[in-house]
Amino acid sequence: MMLESLARVFKVQLPAYLKRLPIPDSIAGFIRLTVLEWLRLLPFLGVLALLGYLAIRPFLPKKKQQKDSLINLKIQKENPKVVNEINIEDLHLAKAAYCRCWRSKTFPVCDGSHNKHNELTGDNVGPLILKKKEV
């Protein structure tokens, strides 16, 4: 039953459909097609475009998948874990910004290096900002 239906589609219905399509004899004939004829051609052209894409897809360049990469590239690499301790009482400024992207040349203080890092990688890292509470 299933194979008979499939055979009917390929032997009878598909050839009949292709015969009814308004395919012009020349390229100039495409200009003379009416809107209704273009609408009748649309499904056929869509299937051809899909088959063409599926045929060339294996040859298209692959998008590089972003791997998890190291964040800290150069600061205190000899230590197994980098920890900076700052006593809050020692904060003489009303506000201080500390680096969280590991790109700062004045680490642990933020110098805005995360802006370039974010632009290049699409990341959204920012500094840790400490403020004195106003009493």
Swiss-Prot record:
InterPro entries: CISD1/2 (IPR045131), FeS-contain_CDGSH-typ (IPR018967), FeS-contain_mitoNEET_N (IPR019610), MitoNEET_CISD (IPR042216). Keywords: 2Fe-2S, Autophagy, Endoplasmic reticulum, Iron, Iron-sulfur, Membrane, Metal-binding, Mitochondrion, Mitochondrion outer membrane, Transmembrane, Transmembrane helix. GO terms for molecular function: 2 iron, 2 sulfur cluster binding; metal ion binding; protein homodimerization activity. GO terms for cellular component: endoplasmic reticulum membrane; mitochondrial outer membrane. Residues 61-135 are cytoplasmic. Its main location: endoplasmic reticulum. One of its GO terms (biological process) is regulation of autophagy. It is found in: Endoplasmic reticulum membrane; Mitochondrion outer membrane. [2Fe-2S] cluster binds at residues 99, 101, 110, 114. The chain crosses the membrane at residues 38-60. It is a single-pass membrane protein. It holds the Pfam family zf-CDGSH. The keyword Iron-sulfur applies. Binds 1 [2Fe-2S] cluster. It comes from the Eukaryota. Homodimer. Belongs to the CISD protein family. CISD2 subfamily. This is CDGSH iron-sulfur domain-containing protein 2B.
